[in-house]
Amino acid sequence: MRNDGAALLQHRDDIAGISDPGLWVFPGGHLEWGEAAQDGAVREMEEETCYRCHDLRLLTRLPLEEGELLFFWENYDGRQRLVCREGQGLEFVDREKVESMPRQPYLTAVFDLALAAQRCPPFLRGTETNAPKHDG
C-alpha cells in the first residue's frame, strides 16, 4: 500500500489455463513445498515486482474449497523500483478505480481491509507472524 491509500495491483496475462486471466489482482502466487506463508509472500512479491518486503503483515485469510488464500500487506517504501516481471502490468490503484476494473469479487473487500489496517496505529498492527508473544 502506498501512503495515499493506493494499492499495488497486477494485471494478469490473458492466457487460458492460468488463474485469473485478464483480471487485476494483488501480486502473489503459490507456496513452495515446506515454505512458510509469509516467506512465500515475500518471495512471490520479489519475483513478480522486484520489490523486497521488509514489514509484511498478515491481513486476512479467504477459505476456498481447495485450500485458502492468504493476503499480506505492507506500506510501500517509495524507494525500491517496481518492475513488472509477470503479467501485463503493475499499477498503484486507488479504491474508487478498483470498482471499474475486471477483478475477483473479493478484491474490493480485501482492499478495504488493507486500508483499515493502514490507518491503524502501529501498535495495533501486530499479526500472528510478528505480534509479541505472551507468556500466559
Each model region followed by its residue ranges:
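A short local loop/turn or secondary-structure capping micro-motif enriched for an aromatic residue
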Residues: 16-19, 42, 80, 91-92
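Charged phosphate-binding loop/patch that engages nucleotide di/tri-phosphates or the phosphate backbone
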Residues: 108-136
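The catalytic Nudix box helix
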Residues: 26-59
